[in-house]
Amino acid sequence: GLGDVYKRQELPCRIHLFQGLPKGDKMEMIIQKCVELGVNEIIPVAMKRSVVRLDEKKAKSKVARWQLISESAAKQSGRTIIPCIHEVMSFKEAVNYAKDMDVKLIPYELCEGMRATKEALSGLKSGMDVAVFIGPEGGLEVEEVEKAKELGIIPISLGKRILRTETAGLAIMAIIMYHLESGE
């Protein structure tokens, strides 16, 4: 039935990507690829090192455009839902929005080794809401990571190489997808 199709096409966990606002049109590629990989919603976040500053009118038209990109990527990849692209949030609003999610992760280049990543992923269960915070170009400020840690967001590593902001979201999505679907 329909429920089976839904189950087959969608990840067993809902992934919420909090993406630090990148420069130029990188966000379009991030949205397209993360939608292909199964993300549930994407929240653009104005972080300390985000170079881009969008006024309200500009932000609205950007988000509308991003939503269309999400729609076409969802259709093209056979998704049964269209991931929502949220209005731009501040870091404070974003961590508050994520506070009740089951697992909250923040890839951070100063995080040593993959053990924390493995442990965090091993706790994922079907039906969970997973928040993933990605810094913009230039990464996360130390105080953003500290604030995140205070709120139960776990710093993880995505490997020994420093990833660009547009690569980090894809990497964590692919890792989560593999982890959740490798038993099938």
Outline where the language-model segments fall:
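Short, hinge-like loop/turn segments at secondary-structure boundaries
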Residues: 59-63, 123, 174-175
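Conserved residues at beta->alpha junctions
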Residues: 21, 136, 166-167
